Structure formats: structure tokens, C-alpha cells
């Protein structure tokens, strides 16, 4: 017992020492710079998207475990997909132990934020919106975690989806709280899932 503790403690310290913060700011080639950061980020790192309006023509994706991606507020860090040409969603997450917080995803061609096959996904203080108002041509879902475990949606806002603002499907251990869904066909929908706690919305 003592030897296990002795060796594991320095290992934990070493992992924390190598964790870093990575910053991306607005400006030329924002699409390429942000996607590159999402690819190169390492477990334990935090990616900070600085305040600004970022315009994208392609969807973004994250497939690195154990990271945090955060903006500087839903009214300050704006990921704008109005001119999106490719990609089935604004942001696709396929990794475990991820926290996303404090930014907005606007006018995605398809679903705004899709999470698939994740274990441990925290979505905190995020907004998804289609700014042209409710339309059948808007993306189907604002928040769309499926086939996932340990899902937290907290303090989020979903506006204008052509189906559900917040949809959780084929998942388990789910909390949806303190969130707002407006002008969607359905507000919050939990389907084919286990152990869901939905409150204060």
C-alpha cells in the first residue's frame, strides 16, 4: 500500500505540471488556428478562446480526452457558422472527460453542438442559437449528446432549433439543470436514456 501511494503521488504532480493553457484569438485564419488548437491540445490542457466573433465556413471537431475548452462569456466569444459550407454540425465532440464553457455557437448548418460516444462531458454556460428566428431550415438540435455517459448540461441556452433545443439520447447518468430552451419545436427532450435528472429549467 505504501509503495503504491509513494509512486502515484509524484506521477499526479508531474501530470499537473505539464498541463498548460492555450489561447486562440480572433483575426485572420481563425478557422485554421482554432481547429489546429483542437487537434494539438493535450490531455489536461485548457484551450481559451478569446473574446471576439469568429466566422467559420467548416465545422469544428474535438477528439482529445481530458481537456477544457472555454470562452470568455456567451456574449463575448461567438462562434459564427452562418457561412458554413461543410460539416454536419458546428462543433463535434467525440472524446471523454471534456468540459466546454462560456461561448456561443450561432447559425450552424446542422446541429450546433453534437457529442457522440463520450464518457464525461460537461457543457456549462453555453448558448446555441439560430439568429434568423424559428425556421424549418435551422439545424435540428442545439445541444445533442448521444450514446454518452455522465452528461452535464448546466446554465445553457438553446434558441431556434428546428427540432429540440436540448436533446439527450441513448445515454445514461444525465443532468440538465438551470438551462433555458426557447423558440424550438421541442424544448428539452430525453429519449431512450437512463438515470436522467432534469430540474430548475
Positions of the model-derived regions?
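Bacterial N-terminal signal peptides
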Residues: 7-14
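Right-handed parallel beta-helix
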Residues: 44, 70-76, 97-107, 119-132, ...
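Sec/Tat signal peptide C-region and signal peptidase I cleavage site
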Residues: 15-19
Amino acid at each position: 500500500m505504501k509503495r503504491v501511494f509513494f509512486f502515484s503521488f509524484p506521477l499526479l504532480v508531474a501530470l499537473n505540471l505539464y498541463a498548460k493553457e492555450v489561447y486562440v484569438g480572433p483575426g485572420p485564419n481563425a478557422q485554421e488556428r482554432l481547429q489546429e488548437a483542437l487537434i494539438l491540445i493535450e490531455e489536461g490542457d485548457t484551450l481559451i478562446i478569446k473574446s471576439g466573433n469568429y466566422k467559420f465556413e467548416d465545422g469544428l471537431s474535438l477528439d482529445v480526452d481530458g481537456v477544457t475548452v472555454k470562452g470568455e462569456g456567451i456574449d463575448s466569444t461567438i462562434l459564427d457558422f452562418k457561412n458554413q459550407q461543410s460539416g454536419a454540425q458546428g462543433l463535434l465532440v467525440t472524446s471523454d472527460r471534456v468540459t466546454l464553457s462560456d461561448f456561443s455557437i450561432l447559425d450552424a448548418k446542422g446541429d450546433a453542438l453534437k457529442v457522440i460516444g463520450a464518457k464525461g462531458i460537461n457543457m456549462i454556460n453555453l448558448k446555441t442559437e439560430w439568429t434568423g428566428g424559428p425556421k424549418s431550415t435551422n439545424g435540428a438540435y442545439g445541444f445533442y449528446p448521444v450514446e454518452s455517459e455522465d452528461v452535464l448540461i448546466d446554465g445553457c441556452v438553446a434558441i431556434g432549433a428546428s427540432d429540440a433545443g436540448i436533446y439527450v439520447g441513448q445515454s445514461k447518468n444525465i443532468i440538465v439543470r438551470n438551462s433555458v430552451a426557447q423558440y424550438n419545436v421541442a424544448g428539452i427532450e430525453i429519449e431512450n436514456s437512463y438515470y436522467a435528472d432534469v430540474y430548475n429549467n
